[in-house]
Regions:
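Conserved positions in beta-strands of structured domains
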Residues: 110-113
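Mixed-charge, low-complexity intrinsically disordered regions
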Residues: 1-105, 117-126, 130-233
């Protein structure tokens, strides 16, 4: 009989990412869905040596290994309810990307726009398309290698039975003018991907989400999302 393994390892936080999302609500369900979303990865003091990112600028995309810091639990369940199945059907946790896992680790592929060297914090990675909350700890960064990482013929499991939900987004121009120009495209993309929980479909309900220092309120009726108010937090 094999002896049960007692091996464990300690992961060091090498960086944190800063994004437009101070809470989980509204974050795209996968990386790359909203490429216009901009984020900055700032290394912790121990890992700010520019030599550590030498050559990374030659890659267009990178992998991020990170912690579901907003969903850490002491226990785990072998099955979870994926939102894309309406929140009622259970699947094995390892057949999903649920944050409620034995080890709460996430994996995201993002576009590397550029690397800046800033005197106060060293190298900063400017990325696009991240699906991470502001302040999320990063444990590792690896280059995305197309010939090895891209699998066009891969089967999609239960996700092949569901469709990406896109909404028409409507707003009053006076409200939209309250959104900084640099954030408009990202916010529009987030809203178009329907940030509501998958089980909520009340057309009279007013939803609110925080985005880039703004409080954005909206309703959804059928395939149309209407922005009802935007205020500065």
């Amino acid at each position: 009989m094999e002896k049960a393994s007692t091996e464990a390892m300690t992961l060091n936080v090498i960086a944190h990412i800063h994004t437009a999302f101070p809470t989980k609500f509204g974050i795209p369900r996968q990386s790359g869905l909203v490429d216009s979303l901009r984020g900055e990865i700032i290394f912790t003091p121990e890992y700010r040596n520019p030599d550590a990112v030498r050559g990374l600028e030659d890659f267009s995309h990178i992998w991020l290994v990170w912690q579901f810091s907003g969903a850490v639990r002491d226990t785990w369940s072998p099955t979870v309810r994926p939102p894309r199945l309406g929140g009622n059907t259970r699947m094995g946790v390892f057949a999903t990307r649920s944050p409620f896992r034995p080890n709460p680790l996430g994996l995201s592929s993002v576009q590397l726009e550029k690397i800046e060297i800033r005197p106060e914090v060293g190298p900063v990675l400017i990325v696009r398309g991240a699906d991470l909350m502001d302040g999320t700890p990063i444990y590792d960064i690896k280059p995305y290698i197309p010939y090895a990482d891209c699998h066009p013929d891969a089967s999609a499991g239960f996700t092949a039975q569901t469709r990406m939900h896109h909404l028409n987004v409507e707003w009053d121009p006076a409200l939209w003018a309250r959104v900084p120009e640099a954030e408009q495209e990202g916010l529009r993309g987030v809203l178009a991907h329907d940030p509501r929980p998958s089980y909520q479909h009340d057309p009279a309900r007013v939803y609110g989400m925080e985005f880039a220092g703004l409080e954005v309120h909206f309703t959804v009726d059928g395939e149309t999302l209407t922005v009802t108010d935007i205020t500065r937090r």
